[in-house]
Amino acid sequence: MTSVVVVGTQWGDEGKGKITDFLSADAEVIARYQGGDNAGHTIVIDGKKFKLHLIPSGIFFPQKISVIGNGVVVNPKSLVKELAYLHDEGVTTDNLRISDRAHVILPYHIQLDQLQEDAKGDNKIGTTIKGIGPAYMDKAARVGIRIADLLDKDIFAERLRINLAEKNRLFEKMYNSTPLDFDAIFEEYYAYGQEIKQYVTDTSVILNDALDAGKRVLFEGAQGVMLDIDQGTYPFVTSSNPVAGGVTIGSGVGPSKINKVVGVCKAYTSRVGDGPFPTELFDEVGERIREVGHEYGTTTGRPRRVGWFDSVVMRHSRRVSGITNLSLNSIDVLSGLDTVKICVAYDLDGKRIDYYPASLEQLKRCKPIYEELPGWQEDITGVRSLDELPENARNYVRRVGELVGVRISTFSVGPGREQTNILESVWASI
């Protein structure tokens, strides 16, 4: 029984797809356990970029099983589109499995997402308008439609009719918006269900059977710990639990079967959307990092906010996710800077604190306390070991590990598979 969980430790976009793809080489099953198509991940294979939103990164290994777990909310329209995209690129999807217990995103979720966000005015939280939140709301309210329901024509029609009647009343009376048509949604989405039917099964059985047989299972999280609905910067968070604990709920695998948790982070910090960001940069350095790091959202295309590495955030993520290993990405983006900074603590009303406050009001008053290190000018994109890094870059990597309190297993100096350097094999250490 061998399993590894990959989680983002910041606000998403840390490079989880790349690291998952890298670790997938030694896994036999790869599974997603939460989120939806609001999260994008980019994988580079032989110099070619593939952008996925729902399907796990392991899909590029045809001999391995890729699982969309019960904790994922699935937009069938997006899924069918993504499958077609992969097929057009010559990628087989015969190895995909979708949980029959996963909940379905429907057009009324997306419309409600947009209306709710618009109604917030200046208090918007920066949702991707993908219907994720409303779908999880229906799930919690026990009125959601699951994949198993989508495949049953009569049950789907019955539940869609009830839900749509309620949502249309809400659209018309509360938001003064246009109601949606039952027949159009039913026809379109039932057809999507039939297209994905071949992939649908009880994925909890597949995952547990694989673990019981001694196979290596990799769990792939979406977003990041700081977007977790419980542990993140609430309410500027997602509607699910990206933390490692979300694996047990979102995949149907018990906590005793989790061996390692790999936290993925960048050598700096980025964030899409609104919400607290203590180390955010608004100067030329921030603009340089954004451009060199190509910091634009995979899903939204929006420019990401960028800032210095925040070890306070990282220690919070380590604690609430039980991180055992760290993967440090995008070190190359910092090349060319005279100095680099790491936030080691916050100043809150004149008091030094080393924890991440829950209160948004306190966070607004937090000022980062920085440790400044000398930068490096060399191009490090061709580096293939820690010893090949310039001394200042090497010191930066070591200092990150010290401040976070977790050993660094891999570091990356570019987006390619070959640019990921192994310091310690995660699989071998289990």
From Swiss-Prot:
Pathway recorded for this protein: Purine metabolism; AMP biosynthesis via de novo pathway; AMP from IMP: step 1/2
UniProt keyword list: Cytoplasm, GTP-binding, Ligase, Magnesium, Metal-binding, Nucleotide-binding, Purine biosynthesis
Family in the record: Belongs to the adenylosuccinate synthetase family.
One GO biological process term: IMP metabolic process
Natural source organism: Streptococcus pyogenes serotype M3 (strain ATCC BAA-595 / MGAS315)
Primary subcellular site in the record, as a coarse category: cytoplasm
Function in brief: Plays an important role in the de novo pathway of purine nucleotide biosynthesis. Catalyzes the first committed step in the biosynthesis of AMP from IMP.
Lineage: Bacteria, Bacillati, Bacillota, Bacilli, Lactobacillales
Name assigned to this protein: Adenylosuccinate synthetase
Subcellular location: Cytoplasm
NCBIfam families in the record: PRK01117.1 (NF002223), purA (TIGR00184)
Record: residues binding IMP: 13-16, 38-41, 128, 142, 223, 238, 302
Disulfide-bonded cysteines: none
Top-rank lineage group of the source organism: Bacteria
PROSITE patterns membership: ADENYLOSUCCIN_SYN_1, ADENYLOSUCCIN_SYN_2
